[in-house]
């Protein structure tokens, strides 16, 4: 039996999770929330994490009813992510490892999402759509690696949603994407936006620029038809949110279906913070059912960044014999999903 404590702090959430042989014992989390119209800067985010992390470690052990001596391994997010917040998690993980004399493992953030999704949903060998504020990838397992079949060629889908939420001054509480989703539910008026799919890759930066012009006509100089001439003042924020979701989610469904066909898969697993979006799940479910497949998705406890996913992935690594020398316990802002040898899967 492997009992693991995981620390996740790659972006604006700091989370601690404890798991033992696939059983969830604790999953606590705090979110750094900024005022409407503002994003989160690495330095301020790291400060938030520093102030919260030790209390969360204590809370997780109390919730799990465990002592430090009950743990077999300390796991932390090695990357990808923002360096200052990542360092907070890594430094605390190193300290606990030395203090408690427990092995230490660095975990890939994306691998954590995938393995947590597989554990919670029971998906066996799905095509994975990983959608978050920092990543957009279509992934499938093959020969001891999670292979990336398609991805964004510029910004992530969550970044596109977050930046548009800032443009129209939506609240960041509980998250910009959630508030876009709720606002979109009050409209069914579709405004045609750019649709950019290249094989199994997607692009969101042009869509964001285009819809920014619609939301703030005349703010930027551009060569295309002036927004005022398109009577953009007739568009409500709800119309824009609805249209943005419908467009970018259709793109994600298309590339996921293409990857399913390529891999011969009949399962789709959505992971990452954007995976909580009910409209994305609905569109993906329709596609899966039309193909005779099945959709797997989790709720906000597991799809949003959390320490539990790092604990679970780290426990799987530890169980399969993976060990990490202490001097390799660094962090990296760039850590590709397919760099990791998936030693714990035999299929």
Curated annotation (Swiss-Prot):
Substrate binds at residues 130-134, 162, 177, 181, 277. Belongs to the KAE1 / TsaD family. A divalent metal cation binds at residues 109, 113, 130, 305. It comes from Drosophila melanogaster. One of its GO terms (cellular component) is cytoplasm. This is Probable tRNA N6-adenosine threonylcarbamoyltransferase. Binds 1 divalent metal cation per subunit. Its cofactor is a divalent metal cation. GO terms for biological process: positive regulation of translational initiation; tRNA threonylcarbamoyladenosine modification. Component of the EKC/KEOPS complex; the whole complex dimerizes.
């Amino acid at each position: 039996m492997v009992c693991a404590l995981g620390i996740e702090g790659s972006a604006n959430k700091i989370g601690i999770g404890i798991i033992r042989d696939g059983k969830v014992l604790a999953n606590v989390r705090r979110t750094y929330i900024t005022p409407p119209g503002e994003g989160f800067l690495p330095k301020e985010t790291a400060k938030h994490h520093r102030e919260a992390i030790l209390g969360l470690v204590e809370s997780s052990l109390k919730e799990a009813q465990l002592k430090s001596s009950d743990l077999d391994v300390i796991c932390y997010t090695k990357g990808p992510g923002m360096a200052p917040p990542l360092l907070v998690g890594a430094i605390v993980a190193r300290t606990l490892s030395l203090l408690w004399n427990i092995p230490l493992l660095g975990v890939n953030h994306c691998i954590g999402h995938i393995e947590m999704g597989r554990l919670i949903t029971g998906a066996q060998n799905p095509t994975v759509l990983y959608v978050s504020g920092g990543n957009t990838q279509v992934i499938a397992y093959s020969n001891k690696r999670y292979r990336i079949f398609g991805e964004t060629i510029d910004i992530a889908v969550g970044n596109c949603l977050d930046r548009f939420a800032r443009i129209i001054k939506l609240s960041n509480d509980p998250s910009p994407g959630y508030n876009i989703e709720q606002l979109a539910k009050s409209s069914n008026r579709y405004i045609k936006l750019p649709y950019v799919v290249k094989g199994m890759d997607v692009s969101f930066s042009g869509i964001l620029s285009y819809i920014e012009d619609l939301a703030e006509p005349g703010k930027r100089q551009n060569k295309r038809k002036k927004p005022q001439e398109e009577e953009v003042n007739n568009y409500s924020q709800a119309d824009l949110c609805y249209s943005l979701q419908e467009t970018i989610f259709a793109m994600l469904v298309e590339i996921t279906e293409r990857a399913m066909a390529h891999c011969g898969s009949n399962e789709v697993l959505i992971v990452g913070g954007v995976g909580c979006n009910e409209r994305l799940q609905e569109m993906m479910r329709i596609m899966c059912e039309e193909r005779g497949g099945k959709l797997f998705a989790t709720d906000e406890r597991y799809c949003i960044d959390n320490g539990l996913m790092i604990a679970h992935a780290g426990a799987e690594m530890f169980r399969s014999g993976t060990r990490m020398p202490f001097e390799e316990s660094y962090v990296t802002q760039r850590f590709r999903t397919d760099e990791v040898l998936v030693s714990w899967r035999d299929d």
